[in-house]
Amino acid sequence: MHRRLAKVGLRRNTSLVVETGGVHESHDLAVLIAYGATAVNPFAMFHLAKDTPKVTPAVARDNLVKSLVSGLRRIMSKMGVCTIAGYRGSVLFEAIGLSPEVVDYYLPRTQTRIGGMTIPD
């Protein structure tokens, strides 16, 4: 979606908000942002955090956000990126275990040196 919007000149006027239960750690968040997400709502993590014993739901939520942001900053610093704007849409990941045809079709601009599974596989 990010690449398509950029191609037709609409990306700067559009925000991509991903609401997902699939974020389990800061790496998942980093991948979504690197592939173009403007914001991410990891609703399943927030739901689990509110049930954390010995802290209020608000404290648990704040701790979760701090942890995700800290992890994202660590990942960005390892990649040599200092702003979220510079990281968004950067595609600074490599696909492992997927054929170049699959990667080119589903993850444009993503590197894949090893190759692997095809659609029929």
PLM region descriptions:
Residues M1-L16, T20-R74, Q111:
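Catalytic or ion-translocation cores adjacent to nucleophile or general acid/base/metal-coordination motifs
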Residues L29, V55-D121:
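Flexible, glycine-rich loop/tail regions that form catalytic "lids" or insertion modules at the edges
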